[in-house]
Amino acid sequence: VTTRSIATKLAMALALVAAGGVSAALAAQVDHVLLGIDDLDHGIKAFEQATGVKPVYGGKHPGGTHNALVSLGDGTYLEIIALQKGVTDAGEYAGLKQLHTLTPIGWAVSSKDSAELRKRLSAAGLAVTEPVPGSRITPAGATLSWQTFGLKDNFAEAPFFIVWSAQTPHPATTSPSGCKLQQWHVAGSHLKNLEQLRAALDLRIDVADAKATSMRLSLKCPQGAITF
């Protein structure tokens, strides 16, 4: 293979992309992983004791939850989420009061190109819902905003999808650092759907077949490796 032939093939490929013949690479990734717990202060202390990194308080969500955050590097962060003091019901998050240790409860996938993200999912046979706006107020009084959507035929192991407002700094760049994501493992009875999702978005996750849904987060932190 000559240098000239390689250059010719590259030029042809770039021309196809420019003409819309093939889709450019989609920058989709695991945006954040959620660890649920019954009390946020307890969760912050437990995480710091286990890892050597203290999560920073993020703020309150309109729906009755609040959170603390840790950067996991490379555009991914960890969200510890709990009910706000005095809140007894927060819809889908009401079950947080039953969690007495930090427990993986969900995950999100992000992309800066919402239209392409939805297109890829649709092409893989995964229909999506309409976007819903979301927000959080920081301790400094700033409002962070985003849009989320999910799969129409949702299942327990599935992520939700998030597109951050252009004016909102990503939490991975503003939260305490020191921990790195080593592995995000998702298992459940919808293995085929998980594999479709992983392939469509080229996600770096591990998936497995199981009767019951389970999620496992492995980190490398200042005090060593830890798994939740």
Predicted regions and their residues:
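A basic- and aromatic-enriched beta-loop-alpha substructure that forms the phosphate/nucleotide-
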Residues: 83-117, 121
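Bacterial N-terminal signal peptides
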Residues: 9-21
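Glycine/small-residue-rich interface belts in oligomeric ring/scaffold proteins
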Residues: 40-96
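N-terminal beta-strand motif that seeds the catalytic metal site of vicinal oxygen chelate
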Residues: 25-40, 102-112, 160-192
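N-terminal short leaders/motifs
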Residues: 20-28, 61-63
